Amino acid sequence: MPIAYKNINQLWAYIFTETLKRLGLAYAVICPGSRSTPLAVAFAQQAPNIEAISILDERSAAFFALGIAKATNRPVAIVCTSGTAGANFYPAVIEAQESRVPLLLLTADRPPELRDCHSGQTIDQMKLYGSYPNWQAELALPVSDMGMLAYLRQTLVHSWYRMQAPTPGPVHLNIPFRDPLAPIPDGTDLSYLLAKFHPEEFFAGITDTTPLPHHSPLSIPPEWLQSQRGIIIAGVAQPQQPQEYCRAIARLSQTLQWPVLAEGLSPVRNYADFNPYLISTYDLILRNQQLATRLAPDMVIQIGDMPTSKELRNWIDTHQPRRWVIDPSDQNLDPLHGRTTHLRIRVEELGYQGVEEDKSSVSEYLQLWCNAETKVRVNVDETLDKMEDLVECKAAWLLSQMLPPETPLFIANSMPVRDVEFFWKPNNLRVRSHFNRGANGIDGTLSTALGISHRQQSSVLITGDLALLHDTNGFLIRNKFVGHLTIILINNNGGGIFEMLPIAKFEPPFEEFFGTPQDIDFAQLCTTYNVQHELIHSWVHLQQRLNPLPNTGIRVLELRTNRKIDAQWRRDNLSNFAADNII
């Protein structure tokens, strides 16, 4: 063995990290603290196989780990000390569960005899995250026994599996340690144990063999083939293999001759050449009530989560079509509680044996959708192309055309995700979009984006000012971060999304409690964190900064907008793009 083990905690932590290394763990985020010392030291000693990244703030660290897991589609471990430290992981744990991301939460704890007696930095850490983990357990105290070392190894093997199957999500292990925590002698004679411990024999067969759920191909239901008034909704999705995912949706669309209403947060819009029946302006089309009635479907296939659009949701709720949801998770993805059947498979697992694509003429219903898309798309593009003022909605439209191919993009919640849904233009850039749409919070925005960008291609974050301010501790990661992140900051000095809600008409209390202007000088803020800042003066200026992107560092490109003008622009235009589009 590479290390002379001086106490049982050190050996226990070695077994712990060595097992995870052999299972395939590549990243461990470590928050500073005393009780977690054995794990921190052991993870550090696993370099370069495991990159151990030290991050001060636990909430930020958890979202950074979440971002890495999203980008790599692999589990990431995060370690903290005892007490309230682990409570700061909670928002990221919720997001990991709701968006199905594998995270391994490792909370160090005091031994049982130091609990419930005011020993200090001790809280009840059992089931700290409620029902959100896929699985959770408290480990036994370290013991110098071969049987217990095998127990530790197999508990980690089981944890690795439960993070990824049957549905990805977080796993929480609470890990008590007695003193001494540092690798110093504790008087225990480990020689007899180490004489029986042969690492290659002990770890034999420990590899990343997590079985991916596999289903026999599901035959296309006959009723789908018989309907000419069906639609496919490509909803919010971050598939591991976006190209295969988009090809599968395109094949289904062309087989059924149904249009694909593709969310801006679906990769389908970034692989537009695959799908001739792609509808990107459905939210705008459905604001024309007469046209929306003519387009009412008999059947709907929803792939992944329901899109954000309230127009789409209300339209489906009004017409109550027969619906199917295709998604392998065990979650209920129908917030409308309609006549819905959940097919627990991936869209790639649909079977086409004996089914031929319909090569006949396009149905009147499909043609109606395609004509509407063409006209509304032209209206949107012409309007935004002529726009010279810095109105925030144009940023999403511009990004969809200007980013380097395959750029990782993190889209913050509130208005950015909605502007992407409204205005993201179909393209063939294969942009890799990421987002926290599990619980839809603004917390952890910057840290998640940095995690997604770490050791990846130069990346972009589009965010509002409040979402960025909510997570400025993420800038503390800058010295650990490897790669580049450009932050497109839409600074409208407050919560622009609330300007679109009925409460905006009530002043007071609107500005104080909903608009919440913070009046922050972002140039000064960036100076504090030693982050590059540039004020963007025009759309041409922004385009010049987007392609190519730098290779290293973090920079903020700030667009100052007026949220009341932005809101008025939306009120004036969103319902008009399809107003004269009655076919």
Curated annotation (Swiss-Prot):
As for what it does, the entry says: Catalyzes the thiamine diphosphate-dependent decarboxylation of 2-oxoglutarate and the subsequent addition of the resulting succinic semialdehyde-thiamine pyrophosphate anion to isochorismate to yield 2-succinyl-5-enolpyruvyl-6-hydroxy-3-cyclohexene-1-carboxylate (SEPHCHC).
Domain of life of the native organism: Bacteria
Q: Which cofactor does it need?
A: Mg(2+); Mn(2+); thiamine diphosphate
Broad enzyme group: transferase
Entry keyword set = Magnesium, Manganese, Metal-binding, Thiamine pyrophosphate, Transferase
Looking up Gene3D superfamilies in the UniProt record yields: 3.40.50.970, TPP-binding domain
EC number annotated for this UniProt entry: 2.2.1.9
Q: Name one GO molecular function term.
A: magnesium ion binding
**Keyword hit for Repressor:** no
Q: Which InterPro entries match?
A: MenaQ_synth_MenD (IPR004433), MenD_middle (IPR032264), THDP-binding (IPR029061), Thiamin_PyroP_enz_TPP-bd_dom (IPR012001)
Which family does the entry's similarity section mention? Answer: Belongs to the TPP enzyme family. MenD subfamily.
GO BP field? menaquinone biosynthetic process; phylloquinone biosynthetic process
Q: Per its record, how is this protein called by name?
A: 2-succinyl-5-enolpyruvyl-6-hydroxy-3-cyclohexene-1-carboxylate synthase
Q: Which SUPFAM superfamilies match?
A: Thiamin diphosphate-binding fold (THDP-binding)
